[in-house]
Amino acid sequence: MSASLEGRLDINLILHADVVGEIAVRSSRPRLAQKLMAGLTPLAAAERAGLIFSLCGKAQRAAAEVACEAALGIQSGAEIEIMRAQQVLIELAQEHAWHFLLHWPQRAAETADMASLLALRKSAADPTQFSLKLEQLLNDVFLGEPASRWLTHDLAAFDLWRKQAATLPAKLFRTWGGGADHGISQAPLLPPLRQLAPSQCAELAHLALANEDFCGQPEWTGGPAETGAIARQQQHSLLAAWIDARGRGAGARLLARLIELANLPQQLAGNQVAVVKAFNLGENIGMSAIETSRGLLIHVVRLAGGRVADYRIVAPTEWNFHPAGALVEALTQAIADLAPCEAAATCAEAVCQSLDPCVSFAVEVSHA
């Protein structure tokens, strides 16, 4: 999708007597799902979804396909369901790998590992080969040891690993130290898809259909919520120990991605948790929910005469960058004691990056 269609996020730190006293999050992301999809056949809608979104394109296409099939009352065969889940997981793995091999190293003034990232991407067409390549890279590049062993580490063993291992992720975690996490948030976590009841999904779908503004500022049980790997991995013992000791901040989000990445070869081998679900809501209405690298993606469609009449998309970025959500709460706590403008802006950028928006963002400092 072009930049004009994607929009962007503007985070404004408003100073009162040289101290950040207010945080404003404004999104210029246009809600174009209705305009782009209305009047299309289900097949054309799925094709368009895969083309217009530059990030998570496979997940977006799958979401459109699944939502339209649900509206038509079509039940996909087991082979198609497995193929879709594998494509979503492969795309998710590549996004996580990009963070650890390219994005965060550049921010931390470390040397990026583009060669490993390209090797992983070259194997993406074959789930078996991708799983084998990812397992090898986890051992040689990401962790420095077998993923099965690394995943058993408690917090003390993890701290020893990040201090001693020569891998790029270990070096990145060294910068966190052993103190409190950066940008701690207490915002509720959106339950992972595997824990969402059909009635809860149906409620989200009906809210989106009834009010298009809900798609831009979604709420869970009456308030904002955070979604992503941290919500899916919150019960893992290592992540839970980190959060108990250091808080749920940028470091916890990064750790959740690494834990999820380390588990992905096993998931691709067949031990898959729910990453794609379909819901027929009656009256030619269908909903899909898909776990992407950034969090839960929801598509809702109402068909009339075999074509799209209403279409809604609730993307992870809208959850995490809600004007009163996880970002604002995290920044409020993180920069409360940071008087220098530069320190506050740097902190804000790091927290924003940890929440991983699917569009560009800018942090600005202004006076009240």
Predicted regions and their residues:
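Mixed-charge (Asp/Glu-Lys/Arg
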Residues: 306
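Acidic, carboxylate-rich catalytic segments that either coordinate divalent cations
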Residues: 311-312
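Active-site bordering "gate/hinge" segments
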Residues: 1-294, 317-368
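Short, acidic, Ser/Thr-enriched surface-loop or helix-capping motifs
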Residues: 303
